[in-house]
Amino acid sequence: MPSRRLHSQPDASVHPWLRRPSGRQLVADVQRMAIPELTRIFGQYGMYLRPSAEMPAELSGNMLGRVISLHRTSQGFDGQLRCADGELPVASGSLSLVYSLFCLETSPDPAHLVGEIARVLKPEGAAMLICANPWSLARRGPAMGVARAERLGREAGLDCVRCHSIGPYWPRIEGAVGGQAGGRWFDGFRAATLLVMRRREAGLTPLRKSPAAVGLRPGMSAG
């Protein structure tokens, strides 16, 4: 197993804007606006993928029994587990939620990462994919458009059930921006997009049991 990165060494995968007060405030605003969706998801286990070790490891607002918290590194993810993007060390179909915060756009292979997210989800489990909006003036790092993120999810077997524009419109340092994720036309310029996707399993339709055949005797008629 490779040696752990020393805390004094900068993580090459963390973009400088996340280290600034404005970047940390933007992340806080985005997560605050995602809480209404987060509180709709219940279950025993979940996973939180965050963009930096400097971000809090706790996923505030979750309704799960336990959340595995990992952070982005130049080699993949580290934290409670260490792994590459395409090799999440979790059993298939074991999680009720995977919450990815600005991790798809920093992945060397986002298709593999989304495929792994879909694999570890239970049937009807939810993936909350938060990506930086390429059209926003608030973001300062890499971004991923909602169309591409949704396509990656569909190709991995996930269905999009809701999509929200969240976060501030402009970079700021002071307190959190007011408002809710909504349907105003200019919401498309917010800092991030939240896709809520679910893993669908084709269910088997039970066949009705046919009544036992009755032989007709002379003098009997059907009906």
Where on the chain are the PLM-derived regions?
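Class I SAM-dependent methyltransferase SAM/SAH-binding core
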Residues: 32-88
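A short acidic, Gly/Pro-enriched loop at the edge of an enzyme's catalytic core
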Residues: 86-98
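A short SAM/SAH-binding and catalytic strip from SAM-dependent methyltransferases
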Residues: 96-109
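A short glycine-rich, Lys/Arg-flanked "PGG" loop and its adjoining helix->strand segment in the class I
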Residues: 111-123
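Short alpha-helix
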Residues: 142-167
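C-terminal lobe and adjacent flexible extensions of AdoMet/dcAdoMet transferase-like proteins
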Residues: 179-223
